[in-house]
Amino acid sequence: MAVRSARARRLQTVLLLALIVIGTGLLLTRCPANRDGMPGQLAQAMTETTSAARSGASALDMWMAERSTAQLTSVQLSDARDEVINAYEGIAELRADDPADIARQQMLTESMTSIIGTLNAASAAVRGIASQPPADRVRNDLLAVAAELERGYR
């Protein structure tokens, strides 16, 4: 009986280790940066950028509908800008070898720069700086750039 229980414990240990290894492998393959290399990193940065642009547009929607304060909207716009900056930093120094990746990286960094500028203009509009375009135009610009980025990236 003792031999059988020792064998069962060993088998249990081996199965547990196998499950941990398989689980870790599955977790790593779900991450696009690990699964797809540079294309995955670029796709992730594109997703983060379009999400941030849409978050900024949503913050402006709430502010224009008077459902949010100028201070909260400014914080949300700053957070969206920071998300784009972090995504930019993640891909700006990547060294692409594939012409398609080089083109995507260039298009993505140009779009990110445009979105950062638009988010800055949105923040200025919320703060009431007269030389900035109206908030509804900035909101539409954010949504248009996000949609164009998604269309152009594919």
Where are these regions (language model features)?
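Short, Lys/Arg-rich N-terminal segment immediately upstream of the first membrane anchor
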Residues: 1-9
